[in-house]
From Swiss-Prot:
It comes from Pseudomonas aeruginosa (strain ATCC 15692 / DSM 22644 / CIP 104116 / JCM 14847 / LMG 12228 / 1C / PRS 101 / PAO1). Signal peptide: none annotated. This is NAD-capped RNA hydrolase NudC. It is an enzyme of class 3 (hydrolase). The lineage of its organism: Bacteria, Pseudomonadati, Pseudomonadota, Gammaproteobacteria, Pseudomonadales. A motif (Nudix box) lies at residues 175-196. Substrate binds at residues 84, 127, 140, 208-215, 257. mRNA decapping enzyme that specifically removes the nicotinamide adenine dinucleotide (NAD) cap from a subset of mRNAs by hydrolyzing the diphosphate linkage to produce nicotinamide mononucleotide (NMN) and 5' monophosphate mRNA. The NAD-cap is present at the 5'-end of some mRNAs and stabilizes RNA against 5'-processing. Has preference for mRNAs with a 5'-end purine. Catalyzes the hydrolysis of a broad range of dinucleotide pyrophosphates. A divalent metal cation 1 binds at residues 174, 194, 235. The keyword ATP-binding does not apply.
Length: 278
């Protein structure tokens, strides 16, 4: 976080009065000309399709809550903005706040009823958990660990693109950790599945919260060992070796994918190493 700690995650009690509130639905936030934070009591007086309310932390010392709405209704003078645009542009502290609020909102939406007996779940005061009053099932906010890796071969990097990417952009390889495997095993497996090559000498670089919708990206560098590139059908549109002096359009600066690439470039050139945002 930034040095002034403008945003701090937490659990301010919903029973207390006042504070700021964010309105969230489908990974979008309500905003007007003054921004995304609204006076809490005022916004709650509007006719909103409210599913849940949770305290999410403090912004500049003031409590912040998120209202999870059933649908993104229209309100005069307001519009809905996607979370991803705040990742790419603007204040990074604000993005951290929105990312956390989005994850809590989605968790609240998906756990309104017990998956075991169907009883309505209840939020608990002592920790961030939804509990079933009937059978006692606990549901904590979901976190999905994913690996992301830059595969290198000297002055070349292996980059790929998914059909879902912005046209022309190539990125590092990524995939979810499966049950029963370590993150390192996931790296080797995903690289083999997505592009058909073998890697070794894995180096853990760092992690980044990725609230789309609830991933934790664990970044690695890996060295190429053997194999020819064979893109995975339906997952990888194209994959190539790129020279460091002839790279294609790359992911956004704030992403861990871009950090892995920039870090390798810095190490090969002897330049100062970049710092991973967050």
């Amino acid at each position: 976080m930034a040095g002034e700690f403008r945003w701090q995650a937490g659990r301010p009690a919903t029973a207390q009065v006042g504070g700021w509130v964010l309105a969230h639905c489908q990974q979008r936030f309500l905003q007007d000309d003054n921004g995304l934070l609204f006076p809490r009591e005022w916004l709650k007086r509007q006719e909103l399709p409210l599913l849940a309310e949770h305290g999410v932390g403090h912004w500049q010392g003031e409590p912040v809550y998120v209202l999870e709405l059933d649908e993104p209704i229209e309100l005069p003078g307001m519009a809905w903005a996607p979370l991803r645009q705040f990742m790419l542009h603007g204040d990074f502290d604000q993005f951290c706040m929105l990312g956390y609020a989005s994850q809590i909102g989605i968790w609240a939406r998906h756990n309104r009823f017990c998956g075991n007996c169907g009883t309505r779940m209840q939020a608990q005061d002592h920790e961030r958990v939804m509990q079933c009053p009937q059978c006692g099932l606990h549901q904590y906010p979901r976190l999905s660990p994913s690996m992301i890796v830059l595969v290198t071969r000297g002055d070349e990097v292996l980059l790929a693109r998914s059909p879902r990417f912005v046209p022309g952009v190539y990125s590092t390889l990524a995939g979810f950790v499966e049950a029963g495997e370590s993150v390192e095993q996931c790296v080797v497996r995903e690289v083999r599945e997505e592009v058909g090559v073998e890697v070794a000498n894995l180096e853990y670089i760092g992690s980044q919260n990725w609230p789309f919708p609830h991933s934790l990206m664990l970044g690695f560098h890996a060295e190429y060992v053997s194999g020819e590139i064979v893109p995975q059908e339906d997952e990888i549109e194209d994959a190539q070796w790129f020279s460091l002096d002839a790279l294609p359009p790359l992911p956004a600066q704030r992403s861990i994918a871009r950090h892995l690439i920039d870090l390798y470039l810095a190490r090969r050139s002897g330049a100062a190493e970049p710092v991973l945002p967050g």
